[in-house]
Regions:
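Terminal, low-structured helical/coil segments at or just beyond the last alpha-helical repeat
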Residues: 22-35, 47, 133-162
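Structural marker of alpha-solenoid helical repeat scaffolds
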Residues: 74, 108, 139-142
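Residue-level recognition of tetratricopeptide repeat
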Residues: 78, 112, 144-147
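Register position in tetratricopeptide repeats
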Residues: 50, 91, 125-126, 156-160
Length: 162
């Protein structure tokens, strides 16, 4: 009987705590779920890319971009959305547009690690190594993986693009 009582109390507390942690006004909003869906598509596309299924990956990147556009319409001050918009357009080969998204994101958050890394990668891909090194300089003191990844990409002149 004592075990059943403890079990019931535990279940009640865990349910109560889970309910207390959820808020209908938090990330359950449509724009957050659209953004989250886009991020999932980007990750799936990346896995396909690693398997050399490039056409399928590009289709997923394009699909993710469409979702990101919708998310951006309702949250224009989110640098993460702009980062992924730049990433997806870069992955389908639209470097000019990707650069615009990255630069727009940096206007909002100049020290955004992801944007600085990906913009640096774009600069390597478009043979603008000096500009890539500028992005690396911004990341120098971040103590982050983005610094190491961009540094490797610059050293290998893009043969290690992620």
């Amino acid at each position: 009987m004592k075990k059943i009582t403890i079990l019931l109390i535990s279940l009640f507390l865990s349910t109560t705590l889970m309910a207390a942690g959820s808020d209908s006004s938090s990330s359950d909003t449509p724009k957050a779920s659209i953004y989250d869906d886009a991020v999932k598509l980007v990750k799936r596309a990346g896995k396909l890319e690693k398997k050399q299924k490039l056409d399928k990956a590009k289709k997923l990147y394009a699909k993710a971009f469409s979702k990101l556009e919708k998310a951006y319409k309702s949250d224009k001050k989110n640098p993460d959305i702009l980062n992924y918009m730049g990433f997806t357009t870069r992955k389908v080969g639209n470097f000019d547009q990707a650069e615009k998204f990255y630069l727009e994101g940096l206007k909002i958050k100049p020290n955004h690690n992801g944007i600085n890394e990906y913009l640096g990668e774009l600069y390597v891909q478009t043979d603008r190594i000096d500009k890539a090194k500028e992005r690396l300089e911004v990341l120098k003191n971040c103590n982050c993986e983005e610094y190491g990844e961009l540094e490797l990409i610059i050293k290998t002149r893009g043969s290690k693009v992620y």
